[in-house]
UniProtKB/Swiss-Prot annotation:
GO terms for molecular function: ATP binding; GTP binding. ATP binds at G18, L19, S20, G21, A22, G23, K24, S25. This is Nucleotide-binding protein SAR0820. PANTHER family: RNASE ADAPTER PROTEIN RAPZ. InterPro entries: P-loop_NTPase, RapZ-like, RapZ-like_N, RapZ_C. Keywords: ATP-binding, GTP-binding, Nucleotide-binding. Gene3D superfamilies: P-loop containing nucleotide triphosphate hydrolases (3.40.50.300). It comes from Staphylococcus aureus (strain MRSA252). GTP binds at D69, L70, R71, G72. It holds the Pfam family RapZ-like_N. Belongs to the RapZ-like family. Displays ATPase and GTPase activities.
Length: 303
């Protein structure tokens, strides 16, 4: 059995954690539909015992997802140490997924569901303070996550699609590059590892015929690409990424999020994200996906 076959035969454990209200339950439901054995809110101290069960070769535990959150606050503090210990001592492949969202979006979701945040301590603490405290408590586990997903702008359907994209394919290459266009006026892409600002390029918005279109339209794309500044920028950008991306993979990252922003996220960033996605697909044998976060907002299209 070669090394690739050995890797495929190993059991896989995905620890799903993150901010309350960011979508952990939805992710667990999605993974369960995809055939994962799912456990909700396992105390971190029991994680090594659970991994021991997985190592016994039970077929039903070959792919496992465990949701862990701050409901057991004291127990949660040991999570990073436990994950590190299990990774160093077990043959089980362990990934950590961290879900987050903006404070404003989390507040909105809690108001919609009328549920109490687990750290509100029966009304002794305000919702915004509970969210801020949780964000602080989770900063360490976030720092070791293989996947960080910002669900602020994602609908439940879009979040499920992203999870399926990552985990549904048995032959899935473990390194994924997500290229996202966005508009600065709608907020920065919070889960981005690299952010590039292209607002210095000539803006198609000021060409009347191009204003209602997006960077997905040929006329807008050609307008953005015809400038010398664009060519110089793209050449320097790809040189940088050619150097950096292999290093990210070598360091054990499973995902790299590259965000390209312009003013509204409709023209320049969309065109360049498309071009970059095509380039990365040609140069690397990784999974490359392109997403346009705000193009539909500015163009007036329905999502």
């Amino acid at each position: 059995m070669d090394n690739n076959e050995k890797e495929k035969s190993k059991s896989e454990l995905l620890v799903v954690t993150g901010l309350s209200g960011a979508g952990k339950s939805l992710v667990i439901q999605c993974l369960e539909d995809m055939g994962y054995f799912c456990v909700d809110n396992l105390p971190p101290v029991l994680l090594p015992k659970f991994v021991e069960l997985m190592e016994q070769g039970n077929p039903s535990l070959r792919k496992v997802a465990i949701a862990i959150d701050l409901r057991g606050k004291e127990l949660f503090n040991s999570l990073v140490a436990v994950v590190d210990k299990v990774k160093s001592e077990s043959d089980v492949i362990i990934d950590v997924m961290f879900l987050e969202a903006s404070t404003e979006k989390l507040i909105s979701r809690y108001k919609e569901t009328r549920r109490a945040h687990p750290l509100m301590e029966q009304g002794k603490k305000s919702l915004i303070n509970a969210i801020n405290d949780e964000r602080e408590h989770l900063s360490q586990i976030r720092s070791i996550a293989n996947f960080v997903i910002d669900t602020t702008k994602l609908s439940p359907k879009e979040l499920k699609e992203r999870i399926r994209r990552y985990y549904e394919d048995e032959e899935f290459e473990t390194f994924t590059i997500n290229v996202t266009s966005f508009g600065f006026k709608h907020g920065i892409q919070m889960d981005a590892d690299l952010v590039f600002d292209v607002r210095f390029l000539p803006n198609p918005y000021y060409v009347v015929d191009l204003r209602p279109l997006t960077g997905l339209d040929k006329d807008v794309y050609n307008y953005v690409m015809k400038w010398k500044e664009t060519e110089i920028f793209f050449e320097k950008l790809t040189d940088l990424l050619d150097f950096m991306i292999p290093g990210y993979k070598k360091e054990g990252k499973s995902q790299l999020v590259i965000a390209i922003g312009c003013t509204g996220g409709q023209h320049r960033s969309v065109a360049l994200a498309e071009r970059l996605g095509n380039y990365l697909n040609e140069v690397f044998e990784y999974n490359v996906y392109v997403h346009h976060r705000d193009a539909h907002i500015e163009s007036g299209e329905k999502k």
